[in-house]
Design a protein with these regions (language model features):
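Alpha-helical structural segments
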Residues: 48, 52, 77-78, 90-93, ...
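A short beta-strand-loop micro-motif that forms or neighbors metal/cofactor-
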Residues: 157, 161-179, 311, 318-325
Length: 325
């Protein structure tokens, strides 16, 4: 199958006319004072580690199967004859995403659906022979993705990382119990609570949801990352910017294009290379960045509210090491 591009909510961010003094300093050519890195660190590192996981997946896993598709195969291999709702809860995916996955994988002959006994409106799911063969062929490669992702940590720190991420995501070890003999494979635990890639995805989904609650549609987290990086490193080019914010060149270019159109970023020719454009924040861009600071802090607070301050710092350090994999 081909790949396909997966507490109390805060008040959405409103547009405010107030300006931060740094915006005026920047406009006047003075020294700027961008927000502290820690305000955005968790979300940015989670996004980067998710991208590392996706890169490893593309490098190692054959056949064009996606991580969510394999997760469906894995769950149904461990617990056949569950319904679609139970599958979605086990994968931490919304109803629409699970329905689309199940429909496409059913059409591809990887899973089968049968009406549940005594409930004509409910279908149970299980792997077909083809689905079982595909799972068996992919499993060793998927295990390598998880092992490569955490290779920089070592066994002890990996265990610590998993425990911290279980707290962040509220994924409880032992909540997903296999009903068939588990496939014993180093790097591919039967319990998703011990799967680093799964925990990173669930945490990233939470961050995205919290960001929408707090900031709304005014500014996306990747756009904020670009503004923040340019506040800290004014005058870098687009290639350098993409590297700094851990985004592929094309998506980074689209973000810069949109922010430039909104008057929040400006491009100027490099005096030493006329073909190269240098990027800086405008006073408007700096003002927008400071407007989102309270909301960004609320996102981080919600995401890490069950961690102590020391645990949060430890998680940041571990995510930072994983982001360089």
């Amino acid at each position: 199958m081909p790949r396909r591009a997966a507490t109390r909510p805060a008040t959405p961010l409103a547009r405010r006319p107030s300006r931060h003094p740094a915006a005026d300093e920047t406009a006047a050519g003075g020294e700027s004072h961008p927000p502290d890195e820690a305000v955005f660190a968790v979300g940015g590192l989670l996004r980067t580690v998710q991208q590392v996981h996706d890169r490893l997946w593309q490098e190692l896993v054959p056949g064009g199967y996606t991580s969510p598709q394999f997760a469906v195969l894995h769950r149904l291999r461990m617990r056949p004859d569950i319904d679609q709702r139970t599958l979605g809860e086990g994968l931490s995916l919304d109803k629409a995403t699970v329905a689309d996955l199940v429909a496409r994988m059913d059409q591809a002959g990887l899973i089968g659906r049968e009406r549940a006994a005594g409930d004509a409106g409910r279908y149970t799911l299980r792997l077909t022979g083809t689905g079982r063969a595909v799972f068996t062929g992919l499993a060793p490669w998927v295990a390598q993705v998880q092992l490569r992702l955490t290779a920089a940590l070592g066994p002890q720190d990996t265990g610590r990382f998993l425990r911290l991420m279980q707290t962040v995501t509220s994924v409880i070890p032992g909540a997903w119990t296999p009903t068939t003999p588990a496939l014993v494979l180093i790097g591919l635990p039967a319990d998703p609570a011990h799967n680093p890639g799964y925990l990173v995805r669930v945490a990233q989904q939470r961050h995205t949801r919290y960001w929408a609650d707090a900031v709304g549609t005014r500014l996306t987290a990747p756009q904020q990352g670009v503004l923040h990086r340019l506040a800290r490193e004014p005058g870098i080019d687009q290639t350098t910017l993409a590297e700094r914010v851990a985004l592929p060149k094309a998506p980074a270019g689209e973000i810069v294009k949109r922010l430039t159109a909104r008057g929040e970023v400006q491009r100027t020719p490099d005096p030493h290379d006329g073909r190269r454009k240098l990027l800086t924040l405008t006073s408007k861009g700096f003002n927008v960045l400071y407007e989102v600071m309270p909301a960004a802090r609320e996102v981080q607070r919600r995401l890490t509210q069950d961690l102590t301050a020391d645990e949060r710092d430890e998680l940041l350090a571990l995510l930072g090491r994983l982001s360089k994999a």
